[in-house]
């Protein structure tokens, strides 16, 4: 392991304790700095979705592009927004509304047959934000996909050697936050041959609090 759990627990406890108390529940975040890896090569970049074992203390917001029965099932499954093919056209004509939607939703899923249209009409808005929908088979029940993404985070380095990810909320059990962090670090371990040579440093912090170095 890049970091042992006990060290993570102590660092998270310190970050929560050091941060000034706010009027809202703050998110606990992790920053991972990499080295000895050429991010100009696409194969070295990280771009993946990680399902956290304990969630973030609050569910992620999910948008679904669908029609007919799948759209109805998505609404029943509690999707935060369901976008029909007609609404794709409306959003394409109203970039401001499209950007607002893209910024307010954490993950999108879409029936596979709708993907080409979404890419053509909304790709310029969704792509740069890392919000291109995950395709699901036509007529598939969207509920399992929605439920999984509720507790997931997206990790994306692009061409940078640093990535940030939320790992929980300050009111969660610290052990659970640490286990979430370890799940994200597993991505780095599985991605690179010598992860200990690739990880330069790891920090944890509350949204508005000071960072605490883990390694």
Curated annotation (Swiss-Prot):
Any one GO cellular component localisation term in the record: large ribosomal subunit
Gene Ontology MF terms in the entry: rRNA binding; structural constituent of ribosome; tRNA binding
A Pfam cross-reference name: Ribosomal_L1
Biological processes per GO annotation: regulation of translation; translation
Keyword terms, alphabetized: Repressor, Ribonucleoprotein, Ribosomal protein, RNA-binding, rRNA-binding, Translation regulation, tRNA-binding
UniProt xrefs under InterPro entries: Ribosomal_uL1, Ribosomal_uL1-like, Ribosomal_uL1/biogenesis, Ribosomal_uL1_3-a/b-sand, Ribosomal_uL1_arc, Ribosomal_uL1_CS
Function summary: Binds directly to 23S rRNA. Probably involved in E site tRNA release. Protein L1 is also a translational repressor protein, it controls the translation of its operon by binding to its mRNA.
Oligomeric form and interacting partners: Part of the 50S ribosomal subunit.
NCBIfam families given in the database record: PRK04203.1 (NF003244)
The family this protein is said to belong to: Belongs to the universal ribosomal protein uL1 family.
Full protein name: Large ribosomal subunit protein uL1
Gene this chain is encoded by: rpl1
């Amino acid at each position: 392991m890049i970091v042992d759990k006990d060290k993570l627990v102590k660092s998270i406890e310190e970050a929560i304790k050091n941060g000034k108390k706010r009027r809202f529940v703050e998110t606990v975040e992790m920053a991972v700095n990499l080295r000895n890896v050429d991010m100009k090569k696409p194969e070295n970049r990280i771009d993946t979705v990680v399902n956290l074992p304990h969630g973030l203390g609050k569910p992620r917001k999910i948008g679904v592009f669908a029609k007919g029965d799948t759209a109805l099932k998505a609404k029943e499954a509690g999707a935060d927004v369901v976008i029909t093919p007609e609404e794709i056209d409306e959003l394409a004509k109203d970039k401001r509304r499209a950007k607002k939607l893209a910024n307010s939703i954490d993950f999108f899923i879409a029936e596979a047959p709708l993907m080409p249209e979404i890419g053509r009409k909304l790709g310029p808005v969704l792509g740069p934000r890392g919000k291109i929908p995950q395709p699901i088979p036509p007529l598939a029940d969207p509920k399992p996909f929605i439920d999984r993404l509720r507790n997931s985070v997206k990790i994306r380095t692009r061409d940078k050697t640093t990535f940030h990810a939320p790992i929980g909320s300050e009111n969660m059990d610290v052990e659970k936050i640490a286990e979430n962090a370890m799940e994200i670090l597993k991505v780095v371990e599985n991605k690179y041959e010598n992860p200990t040579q690739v990880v330069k440093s790891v920090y944890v912090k509350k949204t508005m609090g000071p960072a605490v170095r883990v390694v």
